[in-house]
A protein has these predicted regions:
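Catalytic cores of alpha/beta
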Residues: 150-165
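Conserved Radical SAM active-site core
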Residues: 1-100, 104-112, 125
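Charged, low-complexity surface patches
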Residues: 54, 120, 152
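A structural motif corresponding to the C-terminal end of an alpha-helix
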Residues: 64-70, 126-138, 166
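Active-site glycine-rich loop that binds ribose-phosphate moieties when present
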Residues: 120-126
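Conserved strand-turn element in the central/C-terminal portion of the radical SAM core barrel
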Residues: 106-108, 114-117, 130-152
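Short, hinge-like loop/turn segments at secondary-structure boundaries
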Residues: 91-93, 118, 157-159
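Short, hydrophobic/aromatic alpha-helical segments in well-folded domains
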Residues: 61, 84-87, 127, 141-145, ...
């Protein structure tokens, strides 16, 4: 993850750096592309961190992706993605929108410990169900699997049950 030394971050992991011109950079890149493709976000950092509630940069970027006719793949641990369901539906009607959600444990209390500051699993599950109901394709990532913490048969079975229902 982004804590790796190869990224040469000179601050605490919990500190957030905002690329203030991200929306403008994305628009310039989309304008210059002749061939449409899927635009992905969330591989290295969650696009729906709590600060996104006020910044709305992810929403603005999705609006650009929609306007220019590209597809979108969003990977998050946040139910805040539902705020942008209108744009995701529009993208999906024109191209393709996929929301990928990580589920680590079926236990919300354990989730709060090993994944602080993100939506608990039950909120993510409800988000997956809402996305499904709105016709947005979803993918579930089951990771990390931590030995002796969340690698029990019961936990994995409960997460798989959520996946089937969502």
């Amino acid at each position: 993850d982004a804590r790796s030394a190869c990224y040469q971050m000179n601050h605490d992991f919990e500190d957030i750096e905002v690329k203030e011109n991200a929306v403008e950079l994305l628009e310039a890149a989309l304008k210059s592309r002749r061939k449409k493709c899927m635009i992905g976000t969330g591989a290295m950092t969650d696009p729906y961190m709590p600060i996104e509630k006020t910044l709305c940069n992810t929403r603005k970027c999705l609006e650009l992706i929609d306007r220019y006719g590209f597809g979108a793949a969003v990977h998050t641990k946040s139910a805040l993605v539902l705020r942008d369901i209108d744009i995701l539906k529009s993208i999906n009607n024109k191209s393709k929108a996929v929301v990928q959600m990580t589920l680590t444990t079926a236990d919300d209390n354990l989730c709060k410990i090993i994944e602080p500051n993100v939506s608990v699993t039950s909120e993510r599950y409800e988000a997956l169900c809402s996305l499904r109901d709105e016709g947005i394709p979803t993918v579930v990532w089951l990771d990390p699997v931590l030995p002796f913490i969340n690698d029990t048969k019961d936990n994995i079975a409960r997460i798989l049950d959520m996946c089937i229902k969502a």
